[in-house]
């Protein structure tokens, strides 16, 4: 599939890009004369957790441990699950997220938007 965009009057030919292609391409910000930080909040999932989840899935695929259509189950209370659901959606995996029932509605909605099935548990379950 070929997509054309126009920037400043010029056509830009795009290859099909994946969300995970943008993980890790985060800027350095200067904190002081000798200190810099990576701005991980610029990752597509909004957190540093995008990096390890991408690496884990890349490694599992490379070693033929998972393939599209498989189901991945993760116990999480937040950013790892969001990153997993986001990347799994683009790669064709099903995701089940086990999370505390008291997590924010925003997180639950975001996970569902990426197609994750939520399994909510109460404290002590």
What does each of the following model-derived ranges do?
Residues 1-125:
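PLP-dependent amino-acid enzyme catalytic core
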